[in-house]
Design a protein with these regions (language model features):
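Residue-level detector of alpha-helix initiation sites
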Residues: 1, 62-63, 87
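ADP-ribose/adenylate-binding Rossmann-like module
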Residues: 54, 70-95
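Short amphipathic alpha-helix with an adjacent loop that forms part of the alpha/beta core around
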Residues: 40-51
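Adenosine-phosphate binding glycine-rich loop
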Residues: 83-154
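Glycine-rich adenosine-cofactor-binding loop
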Residues: 1-21
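Residues in the short beta-alpha loop(s) of Rossmann-like NAD(P)-binding domains
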Residues: 21-23, 86
Length: 154
């Protein structure tokens, strides 16, 4: 499952990780990753994100993801992301604005579709792309232009 890959990769890079999914049927086998079965909005509040926190919603279930995102976007977390297509992101932003009264400034902080475009196809590749975006943002890098692309003079 992608959330477990992301959690393991993030832990390897020194992130403190909390995996939240209230659905018992998706419980992972025993791992060294801290886990909670709390509702996502409660988990975000209890986590008390600060400017060094990253929060990513990965369930594809708006009833769960939107709750987490509502709290995350109201927090000082440096990175808030959600999996889903551009069309789903547009619907999500509309729901968050309408039902949770989030401002346009708060909604502008939402990364989605989440992750850098590296052509990821598998859950582990998608997790890697998400962590790459989180890491770039953590280091204050602009994701609009790659520092590795040569400048072309005309």
């Amino acid at each position: 499952q992608m959330s477990l890959y992301l959690a393991e990769f993030a832990k390897a890079l020194g992130f403190q990780v909390l995996l939240c999914d209230p659905r018992q049927e998706y419980a992972q086998p025993a791992t060294p990753i801290e886990r909670t079965f709390a509702m996502p909005d409660d988990a975000v509040q209890q986590f008390a994100p600060d400017a060094h926190s990253a929060i990513v919603a990965l369930t594809h279930d708006p009833k769960l993801d939107d709750l987490a995102l509502m709290e995350a976007l109201r927090s000082p977390a440096y990175y808030v992301g959600a999996i889903g297509s551009k069309a789903n992101q547009a619907k999500r932003r509309a729901r968050l604005a309408e039902h949770f009264e989030l401002s346009q400034a708060q909604l502008a902080r939402l990364h989605g579709p989440v992750g850098l475009n590296i052509g990821a196809r598998t859950p582990s590749e998608i997790a890697l792309s998400i962590l790459a975006e989180m890491t770039a943002k953590r280091h204050g890098l602009s994701l609009t232009a790659s520092p590795f692309q040569p400048k072309v003079s005309t």
